[in-house]
Amino acid sequence: MSYGKQFNTLLNHLSEGVIIVSEDFDILFANEIAIKYFGNKIIDIPIYNVIRNSELIDAINENRSIDTMFLYNSSIGKHILELSYHHKKNNLGILIIRDKTIEEKFQNVRKDLIANVSHELRSPLTTISGFIETLQNEEIDPNQRAKFLGIMKEESNRMDRIISDLLSLSKIEINMYAELDEKINLIDQIKTAKDALDLRADELGKSINIRYPDYDTPNISADSDQIIEVFHNLIDNAIKYSHENSAIDILVELIERQDRSYLKSSVINVGTPISEEHLPRLTERFYRVDKARSRNVGGTGLGLAIVKHILLRHNAELEITSDIDGKTTFSIFFPVDNN
């Protein structure tokens, strides 16, 4: 293989896009990554007809190097690209293209999370701060004092729940790619979660029923603690948002789907219908359909986000449906090893 072909092969194996520009501003070479973004017909085309970025074009015209960001809409989607142009003494220019789309999205998610956490904690802190000022008045009625202290305790508990759920979510993300080396019986884990919530459901006049096959279902590779947490969150939600004196049904069945076996587990409750536009967003952090009601029942807005991340780790799918009668179903599909 000639040196030139070896060099081209090397450039084509880079994770960044590379474009070489002539002194006449024409594109002499583009590696495979650059072609993926800008198409395979860019050779011999002026660079300013391919990348319409004024900062880059000014730098090329003035024979100077530059680093700039570029939002590009291509046939494969919208991309945030970092453009690093280097002018060489032989009047050639080398443009390095790095895709920052995922990194920028991550940064935006991080910023949104910080903003949401700040907002969620500011509200109870403001309430507590206001009552502290009121309680500093020595002439306040004892009954009022007791009432205010009760509210302060509840707001403090709310902050504790938010922080606890955030720590839980962080732990799940840290262990996202850790090996799942347990073989567990799914029904046993669901029963454990159910048993922990039976008393609370009973106190609210509700019941939790579970149905499963009368034969031994296959075990799945999983983290048993996380699976219990998934069903604890789903059953807890069903208790919170179902009608008074209603039943929460849990159904486990072995199904075939797309030529593979799955253990399908559904948590079903009847309450206020959830509009279709809300369903895809229910697993977002701090997303609530009814913010006031969620806070009143002790929701943090993080329970379903925790469920989502645990299921991602387990390569399991979550489907959520809600009909006009208020029957809401959370169905999870756990893949079963067919071997």
Predicted regions and their residues:
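Short conserved segments within the C-terminal catalytic ATPase subdomain
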Residues: 200-211
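Conserved micro-motifs of the catalytic ATP-binding
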Residues: 174-179, 219-222
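Short alpha-helical segment of the dimerization/phosphotransfer core of two-component systems
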Residues: 154-159
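Short conserved segment of the HATPase_c
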Residues: 274-286
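Sensory modules in modular signal-transduction proteins
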Residues: 1-33
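PAS-family sensory/regulatory modules and their coupling/dimerization elements
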Residues: 46-102
